[in-house]
């Protein structure tokens, strides 16, 4: 059974890629997140049709 390329080259690109610092994420509470999704999906579509 063959492989998809040489195992000696495994991880080559990942090792060469410079490490970037992690970005801060906005962690909304679930209620607020659901409300924002509702506004984007339903309220804006309904107002666009009217």
Swiss-Prot record:
Disulfide bonds: none annotated. Keywords: Ribonucleoprotein, Ribosomal protein. It comes from the Archaea. Residues 11-28 have a biased composition (Basic residues). GO terms for molecular function: structural constituent of ribosome. GO terms for biological process: translation. Residues 1-28 are annotated as: Disordered. The keyword Ribosomal protein applies. One of its GO terms (cellular component) is ribonucleoprotein complex. It holds the Pfam family Ribosomal_S30. Belongs to the eukaryotic ribosomal protein eS30 family. NCBIfam families: PRK09336.1. This is Small ribosomal subunit protein eS30.
């Amino acid at each position: 059974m063959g492989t998809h390329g040489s195992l000696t080259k495994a991880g080559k690109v990942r090792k060469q890629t410079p490490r970037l610092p992690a970005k801060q994420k906005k962690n909304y509470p679930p209620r607020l997140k659901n409300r924002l999704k509702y506004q984007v999906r339903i309220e804006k579509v309904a107002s666009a049709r009217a």
